[in-house]
């Protein structure tokens, strides 16, 4: 019997235990203290079996949601599905201030509680304003906020960057982790991307960008054609200065990022092999975020996840916002992938949902792994492949 056995400790095991990088040997037991820190990792034969809680399913570290928009939580069930990205974006612009500040804050608090209940422990969250600060300060979750900037006109890069830095300082004053991020290739000039990326490099913080969420984005960069012309016409923003590049959006913008900082490419729904290979040659710290529920909600299609995996992309998982999703649940995103892309393994997706996400956010020393002397959250996944559910054990 383990000589350290006492009533304060909790001993848990399951059919499988996933560390964040792979599965532990069978009969592994996690020893938790009264603060849910892992004080030891041992085996069944070293413990009095009557003291061990045995669960059916898979134990994992707490999940990392690398892409969310908490400040859009009040738009749940407001925007129609399958409209395409341009009409979705126009609907967000039209409706994002349709509720009182108090109602928006309560929606954010509810979304935060939902994520916690779904086993999420850390979030990479997009913010265009300061409205999420209060909800984040009160949360048990770790948030890294990406203060998102928009300006396709290169002449506006300095002004928008300065406004972004002032907003960034509000999060910093609230003692919330944050850095700048460009919105998307079609809405951020190369000049703005460069300024943001260099600022993140100076601060040693990650950045993020929505990437190839629609094929219209590639049309816009390749030949200055497609649905984004309608977007800019509708919002009455002239884009005479923008010139076609003859390239996909990703190939046109990737060299503007500092290749030494962690950079998240979000969605990648219309990313092909040439795009991936070009990006990987150019940038050595790329992560590729999957948000399948949002992809189905907006464009009704999914990225080629098998291609991303076969080309050694570092995958992470995000929920996107409640404007484009019915719930903020990493396990539900995993279920969607397992249902539609049968060659993808559970192990790959669990690493994407835990260690990879933590590594991207630069919090892998605290989150994303089951290791001795850590308190990274403990989840239990129950059910069968494609129909999993999750509950928090610690």
PLM feature spans:
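Hydrophobic faces of well-ordered beta-strands that scaffold small-molecule active sites
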Residues: 64-66, 123-124, 143-147, 178-182, ...
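His/Asp/Glu-enriched, well-ordered alpha-helical/loop segment
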Residues: 229, 256-258, 291-292, 301-383
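Active-site gating loops and adjacent loop-to-helix segments of metal-dependent hydrolytic enzymes
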Residues: 74-106, 140, 144-147, 215-260, ...
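Alpha-helical scaffold segments that flank or form the walls of functional sites
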Residues: 31, 58-59, 76-140, 162-173
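Active-site gating/metal-coordination segments in enzymes
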Residues: 163-206
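Histidine-centered catalytic micro-motifs
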Residues: 61-73, 206-215
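Active-site glycine- and acidic-residue-rich loops that bind
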Residues: 125, 181-195, 211, 267-270, ...
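N-terminal metal-binding scaffold of metallo-dependent hydrolase/deaminase domains
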Residues: 1-47, 58, 363
